[in-house]
């Protein structure tokens, strides 16, 4: 009995140590950027984006503090079978003060189960909110294939010649459907859920060090019983993607071709906007009565083409390079589409394994389908950087920068709009007659960026 009692504290200590080790085995990942900047003509840092373009060249051209904090853990494992719980909370503020309150965005909360289906070894089933197999161009922060959101699916089914993934996700648009009360008045407007069904076949060997990925996305508006879409709403649409990835020069090149129809053209990345894509508006009658109407302007019947080439390569011991070239044409029946092309490079010269100089040059040109006018802008940034490693991808990084931008614009700028409406390619009320005009500006500052 004495021996047992003497062994008990040791057993408790060992058990506590094991449980403590398990409790600490939490994966912590994330992304963050923050800094301070000034504008040459005065005031805080100004950021530059061509009106109608869906992105901007980001080096020395980001005016917010943004962070994504991810916590995850493998909560169960038996042999090659496992369950993993993943979360992600994101924050964004204007970096104007010490105390800047904000509501966090709960972007991910999902469980992934690996090798749970005996006859599909290597596959993963999942459910919840998730960043799902996103494809982007880092230097312009542009996501061209991204169906992230609440959903479920199965991925990486090994077919021998490639891997198949199936998923369904959802995105909701405000004010998308309505119901009648009397006299055909749109009395109540309700958010509309849009469902996307995604099929991908990846890992198709095409040539030495080259692989092909093919994808089909179908999205449709899913209205609540008793509600309907505005007359003529696109309701649904398709997006087709082919992406070839070539490993080269210690990096990669990606060549992408995409085609989308109707509801899949607005965001152009695989998420649908199948209702009218707008909020309601209110009319006040002479007697003071207010009536809510659904906005009947339909903004996305048509098609979109996109051809994109981007990559990151090493040009020797001292030089790395990022680059992008893209052409996109949105042709809408309401004549509010755009033709956008962009080209840019970001070379990096490495003075030491942890210190470098970067130069980013980017040009955007956007033509209005309605007016035929073009907006164009080029932006040049020179940055001195200290980073954790000798790659153009090495982070964390601290950089000081100077940016110069020049633009000549003739359509679509809403001077006092927010970051969305100010750069909207087309709004539900038509294209604004305001313009940024022909001008230029320069900024300077410092920024940190990290991912882990």
From Swiss-Prot:
Function, as annotated: Involved in the transport of maltose and maltodextrins.
Keyword Transcription appears in the UniProt entry: no
Keywords tagged on the record: Cell outer membrane, Ion transport, Membrane, Porin, Signal, Sugar transport, Transmembrane, Transmembrane beta strand, Transport
GO molecular function: maltodextrin transmembrane transporter activity; maltose transporting porin activity
UniProt-annotated site: Greasy slide, important in sugar transport, residues: 31, 66, 99, 252, 393, 451
Name recorded for this polypeptide: Maltoporin
Signal peptide coordinates: 1-25
Similarity-based family: Belongs to the porin LamB (TC 1.B.3) family.
Record-linked PANTHER family: CRYPTIC OUTER MEMBRANE PORIN BGLH-RELATED (PTHR38762:SF1)
Assembly and interaction partners: Homotrimer formed of three 18-stranded antiparallel beta-barrels, containing three independent channels.
Reaction(s) this enzyme catalyzes, per UniProt: beta-maltose(in) = beta-maltose(out)
One Pfam family from the record: LamB
GO biological process entries: monoatomic ion transport
Site residues by UniProt (Important in sugar transport): 143
Annotated compartments: Cell outer membrane
Factors inducing expression: By maltose.
GO cellular component, one term: cell outer membrane
Topology class, membrane: Multi-pass membrane protein
Domain of life of the source: Bacteria
